[in-house]
Amino acid sequence: PYIDFRWSKGVRTVRIDMPKSYDKNKPYKLIFGMQCMGGAGSIVQDEGYHGLKWIDKNETAIFVAPEGNGSQLPWGQDDYLLFDELLAYLEGNFCIDSSRVFSTGFSYGAMFSNGLSWNHQDVLRAVAVYETAERNIWLPQRKKMGIGWIGVLGLDDGMCTPEMGRNARDIILTLNSGGGKAKNERAEEAQRNAPHKC
């Protein structure tokens, strides 16, 4: 299912997956899935919002996949406004637990979610970014506020390189701590061909 969402800059297709047993009086988590370069919101939806929908066996969340802006680089400055207006629409029309709003994405979608983590800490509880980078077409001013953040990088990714992912991590560690003191509290990375570390 999808809607044609009218916002201040036009119309954007937005895919919404509601729990089958949706109760208008029960607050639900809200999870945004952001498409990658060359991708589509329909692909995010078909792939279960990076697998998160498939593990939501108790139907605790509403999942949303907005289409990008239609260009090769699907998220830009205007899309931060799209996010704000779409979030306001969803909170006004569905029973959302506003303390549990999340965003995730892969590659360019991760870069957009990462950008949101810099200045939307007041509305986002956490982001999960797969193959992210600390850069984008446009990035917001950073707010020195904490947010939950998990990043996964690929050691052989030539576009969103491991170094870009590590830079994104270091920025969040700086924002998440007074005076940036957490910058050196990095999680240990797994060695190549070794088990993941959590």
Regions found by a protein language model. Give the residues of each.
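Mature extracellular/periplasmic domains of secretome proteins
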Residues: P19, Y49-K57, S117, P140
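Short beta-strand/loop motif that positions the catalytic acidic residue
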Residues: G151-L153
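Acidic catalytic loop of the alpha/beta-hydrolase fold
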Residues: D156-T161
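Short, proline-enriched alpha-helix->beta-strand connector loops that line the catalytic pocket
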Residues: K143-W149
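Active-site machinery of serine-nucleophile hydrolases
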Residues: L30, M34-N93, N193-K197
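A domain-start/cap signature at the N-terminus of enzymes
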Residues: P1-L30, T104-A128, T132-E134, N167-D170, ...
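Alpha/beta-hydrolase fold nucleophile elbow
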Residues: C95-S107
